[in-house]
Design a protein with these regions (language model features):
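Juxta-kinase regulatory segment immediately upstream of eukaryotic protein kinase catalytic domains
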Residues: 1-47
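Conserved ATP-binding subdomain of kinase catalytic cores across diverse folds
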Residues: 34-148
């Protein structure tokens, strides 16, 4: 999959906090960024657990100036040496997920709006991909499993 062409899709804005770094899209304001990142990266702030397995997906409500925005957070763990090396060489899975979602969106395929990725500054720390919650959506894997 090729990345979106320069200038295509939403502009990503990098951010850097004491324990976290990442990129956000213009959909997220920066005025309360530190507080929102603290909430996003705390699974205890989850409104609901969506999936618990290899990765953890949970629903949060972002507090934006225009009101609340329901978002899904996917947590990627980097516990093993292999995951840490992979993150070092290829970037975090959260960063790759954001770029893949932007590429899918740029290709005209309907996908939940990508909002951000956040990663720990610690090599073994977690990373998080954040997108808009689509309550009427479905996971593509169920569609492909039904075809098999």
């Amino acid at each position: 999959m090729n990345p979106p062409a320069p200038g295509a899709g939403p502009a990503l804005r990098p951010f850097s906090l004491a324990a976290w770094q990442g990129e956000i899209t213009a959909a997220l304001p920066v005025d309360r960024l530190a507080a929102e990142v603290a909430r996003l990266t705390d699974p205890g702030q989850a409104v609901r657990t969506l999936h618990w397995g290899r990765n953890f997906l949970y629903l949060v409500h972002l507090l934006l100036p225009a009101g609340e925005l329901a978002a899904v957070v996917k947590q990627f763990r980097h516990d093993s040496r292999r995951r840490r090396l992979d993150r070092r060489w290829r970037g975090s899975r959260a960063a790759r997920s954001l770029r893949a979602a932007l590429a899918v969106e740029a290709a005209g395929v309907s996908t939940p709006e990508p909002l951000a990725f956040v990663e720990s500054r610690e090599p073994a720390g977690p990373a998080f991909y954040v997108c808009r919650h689509e309550p009427e959506g479905f996971e593509a894997r169920y569609f492909f499993r039904a075809l098999a």
